[in-house]
Design a protein with these regions (language model features):
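Short N-terminal edge-element motif at the start of the domain
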Residues: 1, 124-184
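Phosphate/anion-contacting hairpin/loop surfaces
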Residues: 1-3, 28, 34-79, 230-283
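Structured domain cores in non-transmembrane regions
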Residues: 2-46, 165-246
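Extended, well-ordered protein cores
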Residues: 45, 63, 68-141, 150-153, ...
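Non-Sec secretion/translocation targeting segments of pathogen effectors
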Residues: 94, 298, 332-342
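Repeat-associated, polar segments at repeat-unit boundaries in modular proteins
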Residues: 115-118, 122, 216, 221-225, ...
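Residues in well-ordered beta-strands of folded domains
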Residues: 117, 145-147, 158, 192, ...
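Short amphipathic beta-strand/extended segments with alternating polar/hydrophobic composition
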Residues: 155-160, 201-204, 330-333
Length: 342
């Protein structure tokens, strides 16, 4: 195993399947995952490769406090983001003392100019079954591999970034990626690879002229993925259905469609039409409060009428059609039908 993280496994016995899985996992780690893994290994000090795999599959048990490279910086970070003092108390709190006290109460390590800590006192790593069939890629909606003049091997960055204390515009994944590339801005970087959790989105690199625009859209895509319509039922199915309806294979258009799902009527595939029709009738104010009439209401016919009214098209993820509301394009340029000339 030639990855620079492999010395952390020195002395551990492993099978070929474990070796191969670890090698692939290391190659697919983002810059942030690499730091989390280094910190977790120092915190847990595993003796076996099985425990190491558990750590890799449980990186969400750990978090990184960006730029907290000593007790002073850690104390400042803690007072800014985690334990915020009153303005009156601030002058009587020494950041170094606060940082040391925070370390004493938790389990963490300073790793390459940052602080990595275990989020729970007793992690549930033992409940994670080491699985060499598990994905070798972290739980990201989209990943971009960047290179720079100072780092031609490149690093992965992934979104959404689940960090709790960070700048939403400049998440840790981006900042750590730039640090690893020894680059100050994305203008000094080039995107060389990309993958997306939505199989419809293809050929991502050729959709963008700059790494900066691609990464900005990837960050927003990650937030959209994480929010999932703030818990709206069948939201992801509707998004994928609308993407299929619009023959969407571009990242920018996918972002626009996610923000305009209210412009589409949708029925999930395999849904109970009777229940769907009843819910739809209540939502549209067709049904009143009379239990007898509601019991006799033909909700299947109402759902079928709704489908016919909007001319819903069949896709792999359900039935959808535009409902007449205007689609607002923020990320992409809408395609216009060619005008006829006399």
């Amino acid at each position: 195993m030639k990855h620079w993280l492999s010395p952390l496994l020195e002395g551990m016995e492993m099978s070929k399947s474990e070796h191969d899985w670890l090698e692939q996992r290391f190659e697919n780690m983002t810059a942030k995952e690499e730091l989390l893994f280094q910190g977790a290994m120092q915190i847990e000090n595993p003796r076996t490769v099985q425990t190491t795999i558990q750590i890799l599959q449980g990186l969400d048990h750990y978090r990184l406090l960006y730029g907290a490279d000593d007790d002073v910086a850690l104390g400042r970070f803690v007072m800014e983001h985690i334990h915020t003092p009153t303005p009156a108390a601030r002058g009587y709190l020494d950041p170094e003392i606060v940082g040391a006290a925070y370390r004493d109460k938790g389990a963490g390590r300073f790793v390459e100019n940052h602080y990595v800590e275990r989020m729970a006192r007793n992690p549930n790593l033992l409940n994670i079954e080491p699985d060499t069939e598990a994905p070798v890629v972290g739980d990201y909606a989209i990943r971009i591999k960047l290179v720079s003049r100072n780092n031609m091997e490149g690093v992965w960055i992934g979104f959404p970034d689940t960090g709790e204390y960070m700048d939403a515009v400049h998440p840790d994944e981006l900042l750590l990626g730039l640090d690893a590339l020894q680059a100050e801005t994305l203008d000094q970087c080039m995107a060389v690879d990309a993958d997306c959790a939505l199989p419809q989105i293809t050929d991502i690199l050729n959709q963008y002229d700059s790494a900066g625009e691609l990464v900005r859209h990837a960050i927003d895509f990650g937030y959209v993925w994480a929010e999932q319509g703030q818990g709206e039922p069948h939201w992801l199915e509707k998004w994928m259905c609308v993407m299929e309806l619009e023959d969407c294979h571009r990242l920018d258009l996918a972002l626009d469609l996610a923000q305009n799902l209210h412009c589409y009527e949708f029925i999930p595939r395999g849904v109970d039409l009777a229940q769907y029709g009843m819910d739809l009738a209540r939502k549209e104010g067709v049904l009143g409060q009379d239990p007898l009439l509601n019991q006799c209401f033909d909700s299947v016919a109402y759902a079928q009428h709704h489908m016919a009214k909007y001319g819903l098209s069949t896709t792999d993820h359900g039935y959808a059609a535009r409902n007449g509301q205007e689609v607002i394009y923020e990320y992409s340029q809408p395609e216009h039908e060619p005008e006829m000339t006399m």
